[in-house]
Amino acid sequence: VKLGPYAVTLEAPLSVALNAADAWRIGLFGVPRAPAGTPSEIAQGALRRNAGAVLNAGEGHFWFMWVSDFGKSLRGAWETLGADYLGGQIDFMTRESARLGYVPSCFNRFHGFDMPWPRGDSLPWLIFAHGERLRRTGRAPDAESREILQRLFDVYEATHFADGIISKEITGDWADTVRRPSSTYNNLCALMALREAPALGLKTRGDAQTLAGRIIADRWRGDHFRDHAATEALSADSAVLSLYLGLFDRAILEKAADRISAERLDQPWPIRCAATPHDGATVPLLTRLVSGYHRAAWLHLGAMWLNGLKRMGRDVGPGRARLDELILRHGHILEAVNDDGSPYRSLVLSSERGLTMAAAQYLELAGL
């Protein structure tokens, strides 16, 4: 059922209730502390507690598994959760996507669904997950899985592209409380998937080199990416993802990193998810109740930023120290914090705690 832009599923009321209850609980009692330990031990504990029938996105109210959260967690979660568990999650998402005919944004232990709406990054992160398993274990998709992935990729390319780039009709992505038309982030995810496809035995209509050229021509502005097709505003998540995956030449990545630093988006905590407030046309009514959420520092994106800088050989010691400070202060891996380091909170939404992709990105940063 559709309600405006929202996909209304049986899980939606539960998610709203969990978010609101957690916001009030944190407002009254603060963030409940996890068992004491070093930042790495706290991160590992969060992953283990979230690893149930599906790898829940968090401990407080994200009691589902988003495909993109899972994909961004893989590099850091591998040693803690193991190939058997993570591989089982990859296989479950693949089989369920085959049943649905597309890759939904979210899963519980029973089925896949979209929440709060379909997203353009789901298929790419499932493809990335298969690629990461291949790199880690040498296990390529078997014939059945490869056939499923080929069908899913065919559907993705047929429905998501227009004129060689992600269509403006595709407005959902990981920042899933705003609707960015043809977000540069979604285009970078498509580039990631096209780069992964050949090693998995998949055939694609497009190719990575051509799409990379289109992205640079359409979205690169000399020292930054613009956020989406309808704006010239600087994109933080596009810079971070490009660094993390090494999607472009080093000269471009260096300029993108320098601009993020010059804008002080990684201060006082790494990293603000948006350089400027989102255009009102991209912000649905319910999101306007939590407008400060997108001006907070999102620590999973911050850890990914630091991992990208680390791959470029830059000093990440000060940034990691700030993450350590927050983890030890709250006794948890948080999702989003205000300038004073307190957890973001509104009447209906609070920062998640024990956030899977933040914990995993931190462990990747720590080299564990």
Where do the protein language model's features map onto the residues?
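Aromatic-rich carbohydrate-recognition surfaces in CAZymes
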Residues: 63-163, 187, 296-306, 316, ...
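Low-complexity, Ser/Thr/Pro/Gly-enriched N-terminal "stalk/linker" regions
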Residues: 2-65, 85-92
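Short beta-alpha connecting loops at secondary-structure transitions
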Residues: 109-113, 286-291, 341-351
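Structural helix-adjacent loops and short alpha-helical linkers that scaffold large soluble proteins
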Residues: 31-36, 77-90, 133-150, 197-212, ...
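Generic long, charged, amphipathic alpha-helical segments
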Residues: 270-298
